[in-house]
């Protein structure tokens, strides 16, 4: 599936389209260069799902938890600062990835060997004209 976002005003529409295709998937690994828009797109998805919390990149916390109106939650990870895979084991990644909650992961390259087999790889590319292309 491919979604093209020509400008920031259309990001919520793109998030709605993405949500329509989530299905039974729960773990999403977001790939893209620094500044490609991973956090911005995840924020739009969370807002469209009804999250009212302040949504920020969990770069220093590693994981943020956002509550949904139905009582479920979303886990938003940023593994940019992970130095060793042992850190992911120490935080108990299995408790999150296999909880049944939605998990949105930034910088999954650093933890690929522990991602669930059914994790959805989402690639965000910044195009020359400033638009973004999302492939999954």
Place the predicted regions along the sequence by residue.
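Short phosphate-coordinating micro-motif centered on Lys-Gly-acidic
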Residues: 1, 47, 86-88, 94-136
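N-terminal pre-Walker A segment at the start of P-loop NTPase domains
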Residues: 1-17
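Phosphate-binding P-loop
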Residues: 19-25
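Hydrophobic anchor at the beta1->P-loop junction of P-loop NTPases
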Residues: 28-30
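The conserved Walker
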Residues: 34
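Conserved lysine of the Walker
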Residues: 38
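Short beta-strand-centered segment that lines the nucleotide-binding/catalytic pocket of NTP-utilizing
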Residues: 51-66
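Mid-chain, well-packed structural core segment of small domains
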Residues: 66-96
